């Protein structure tokens, strides 16, 4: 099942409870345990400025878009073996769609 636009408000709520402890989204936001996600769409894996990535993330070589994030967020450690992202993933496609819809807006403002 591919990405389909979701509910931005539900995505914001999911991000706040499941992602924000490790990631920021605003321009110039700090890297935390995970990298700042501003500008993530169109960026290659392992390229957020000032963040120390694993070799696996740097070498994956894919560009983040709706489809790659949809696959990654289902099971990050399966998609990029060796990633240090501890989050197990969003198993429900609707949750992934909602978070990605939120990220598309929040990481580009």
UniProtKB/Swiss-Prot annotation:
The keyword Heme applies. It comes from the Eukaryota. Its main location: mitochondrion. Heme c binds at residues 19, 22-23, 85. GO terms for molecular function: electron transfer activity; heme binding; metal ion binding. Binds 1 heme c group covalently per subunit. It holds the Pfam family Cytochrom_C. The modification N6,N6,N6-trimethyllysine is found at residue 77. GO terms for cellular component: mitochondrial intermembrane space; respiratory chain complex. InterPro entries: Cyt_c-like_dom (IPR009056), Cyt_c-like_dom_sf (IPR036909), Cyt_c_1A/1B (IPR002327). Keywords: Electron transport, Heme, Iron, Metal-binding, Methylation, Mitochondrion, Respiratory chain, Transport. It is found in: Mitochondrion intermembrane space. GO terms for biological process: mitochondrial ATP synthesis coupled electron transport; mitochondrial electron transport, cytochrome c to oxygen; mitochondrial electron transport, ubiquinol to cytochrome c. Electron carrier protein. The oxidized form of the cytochrome c heme group can accept an electron from the heme group of the cytochrome c1 subunit of cytochrome reductase. Cytochrome c then transfers this electron to the cytochrome oxidase complex, the final protein carrier in the mitochondrial electron-transport chain. Belongs to the cytochrome c family. This is Cytochrome c. It comes from Schizosaccharomyces pombe (strain 972 / ATCC 24843) (Fission yeast). The lineage of its organism: Eukaryota, Fungi, Dikarya, Ascomycota, Taphrinomycotina.
């Amino acid at each position: 099942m591919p990405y389909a636009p979701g509910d931005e408000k539900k995505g914001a709520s999911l991000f706040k409870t499941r992602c924000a402890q490790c990631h920021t989204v605003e321009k110039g936001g700090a890297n935390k345990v995970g990298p700042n996600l501003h500008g993530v769409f169109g960026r290659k894996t392992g390229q957020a400025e000032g963040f120390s990535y694993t070799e696996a993330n740097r070498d994956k070589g894919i560009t983040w878009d709706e489809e790659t994030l949809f696959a990654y967020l289902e099971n990050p450690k399966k998609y990029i073996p060796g990633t240090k992202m501890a989050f197990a993933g969003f198993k429900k496609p609707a949750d992934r769609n909602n978070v990605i819809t939120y990220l598309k807006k929040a990481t580009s403002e």
